Amino acid sequence: MCIVSEYIRTDSFFPLFVQGDSLEVLRRFSDNSVDCCITSPPYWQKRQYENGGIGLEDSPQEYIDNLLCIVKEVKRVLKPTGAFWLNIGDSYQNKTRLGIPWRVALKMIDDGWILRNDVIWNKHKGGLSPNPDRFGSVFEDFFFFVKSDKYFFDADSIRSKPRQAYVKNGAVVSATGVSGIRYKRQIELSTSLTAEEKKNAMSQLNLVLARIQSGEISDFRMVIRNEQRTTHSDSVKLSGRAKELKDKGFYFLFYNPKGTMPNDVWDIIPEDSQHRKMHFAP
């Protein structure tokens, strides 16, 4: 497939469409040549295509094995900086949900893939469920895989624009309304902090408020011993924050001044397929 090799060597932004069996086509790509791969293969026993293909296997395991053969080739052609997005839905057999997406994902992890996210695609709507004894399903898994820990990820381009700090009644207020007054009061009245810890906490809080005023940071939270819940865990073996709280009596959580990252639940309503004669899965 010299046309593929020639296309990869160019700087063209026009897409090249290659038609064929995915496994056979991928085998003709050179190693480490693709920046990103996105696919949504036919789900098991969900759709009958004219030319057959994946998804019509006799068993879930056979389907998973066939998928993993393709995934192996994706890993080979993907650059170390590249990403692989896999959207896959689940199926039922003998009344049980089979867990096919996670069976595939766990096997990929065993094969050396790095799973960065399981993004939940919340479709908001789905087909009418004829089943009287279980809930309808309106979500699918969208796995974000990489094959190297040094992958390309342009975080700043997808952040939500942060709100700005402001001054109210002579006091600087963070983007979400934190002025430090409540924290100062908690420090002063605390029976869990020593006099030295109170002094250090107040000093550090004033420095943080100064950073807010200068625009260096836009928002923060302060956790004070026995005043706020410890982040993640109270165990000093499991949480560095818990150890900091035990040793110092307080710690700070800072918001990224460039904004927050999107979460791992994406609300995307599928294209309306009513009155269509064909199903397109590019």
Where would I find each of the regions flagged by the language model?
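Core catalytic lobe of class I
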Residues: 2-282
